[in-house]
Curated annotation (Swiss-Prot):
Sn-glycerol 1-phosphate binds at residues 166-172, 197-198, 219-220. Prenyltransferase that catalyzes the transfer of the geranylgeranyl moiety of geranylgeranyl diphosphate (GGPP) to the C3 hydroxyl of sn-glycerol-1-phosphate (G1P). This reaction is the first ether-bond-formation step in the biosynthesis of archaeal membrane lipids. One of its GO terms (biological process) is glycerophospholipid biosynthetic process. GO terms for molecular function: magnesium ion binding; phosphoglycerol geranylgeranyltransferase activity. InterPro entries: GGGP/HepGP_synthase_I, GGGP/HepGP_synthase_sf, GGGP_HepGP_synthase, GGGP_synth. Mg(2+) binds at residues 18, 45. Keywords: Cytoplasm, Lipid biosynthesis, Lipid metabolism, Magnesium, Metal-binding, Phospholipid biosynthesis, Phospholipid metabolism, Transferase. It comes from the Archaea. It is an enzyme of class 2 (transferase). Pathway: Membrane lipid metabolism; glycerophospholipid metabolism. It catalyses: sn-glycerol 1-phosphate + (2E,6E,10E)-geranylgeranyl diphosphate = sn-3-O-(geranylgeranyl)glycerol 1-phosphate + diphosphate. This is Geranylgeranylglyceryl phosphate synthase. Its EC number is 2.5.1.41. It comes from Pyrobaculum neutrophilum (strain DSM 2338 / JCM 9278 / NBRC 100436 / V24Sta).
Length: 239
């Protein structure tokens, strides 16, 4: 089964592992797998080399029975050791580089050097606090009080033809995107919807999952309190 087809099936939980933050990334991966996570995202906003991302993906693939997907913070974070890559365009960045500049560079690299990697075009929309991703990409995060603006971006992503949309509250966000915003984006975008950032409890995960995104991502929690992943995964799958 293709990765994209897998993502379309119901609501799944993915664990984000940032090798720049997680020295013992295999320990986190094992916790996530035992908790029942449906996939692993690998990547981060800062400080990761191509050789590092390749080694991490290879190591995780050796113990994982779920897809390993690159969540790139730069064009250097590519490897065929993974199953696929979210080909991100930061729609609400104020810098054209993060909307299309990096993508032109990355597209050439993918075509020449990583032809077997499944590429999923992904509209990346940063909301709320925005975290490191919002800061690095020079974005103007959408306030949680304006789900209508998030929905407008989702409509644009749909009409442009993105295969996926990632609604990002940011790494370590104090709160996740509110259910009202997820609902509005879900209504406007009919393909793969990914929601991440600020999800630290089963209750928060369940509230987001009820709006039927395709993927719910937890990252900071996996780094700081991996024992709690089971609660999150259970909430996602029981919503």
């Amino acid at each position: 089964m293709k990765l994209y087809e897998y993502l379309l099936e119901g609501t799944k939980h993915f664990t984000l592992i940032d090798p720049d933050k997680s020295v013992d990334y295999l320990k986190i991966a094992r916790y996530a797998l035992e908790a029942g996570t449906d996939g692993i995202l690998v990547g981060g906003s800062l400080g990761i080399r191509e050789s590092q991302i390749a080694q991490v993906a290879r190591d995780i693939k050796s113990v994982a029975h779920v897809p390993v997907v690159i969540f790139p913070g730069s064009v250097s974070q590519l490897t065929e050791e993974a199953d696929g890559v979210l080909f991100l365009s930061v729609l609400n960045s104020l810098d054209p580089y993060y909307i299309i500049g990096a993508q032109v560079h990355g597209a050439v690299l993918l075509a020449k050097h990583y032809p077997r990697l499944e590429v999923i075009s992904t509209a990346y929309v940063i909301v709320g606090d925005g975290g490191a991703a919002g800061f690095v990409s020079m974005s103007k995060p959408i306030p949680y009080t304006r789900p209508d603006i998030a929905a407008a971006y989702a409509l644009a992503a749909n009409y442009i033809g993105f295969k996926a949309l990632y609604l990002e509250a940011g790494s370590g966000a104090p709160q996740p995107a509110p259910p009202e915003m997820v609902k509005a984006v879900r209504k406007a975008f009919p393909r793969v919807l990914i929601v991440g950032g600020g999800i630290r409890s089963g209750e928060a995960a369940r509230a987001v999952a009820r709006e039927r995104p395709n993927v719910i991502v937890t990252g900071t929690l996996a780094e700081e309190n991996p024992e709690k992943l089971g609660e999150i995964v259970k909430a996602v799958k029981s919503a």
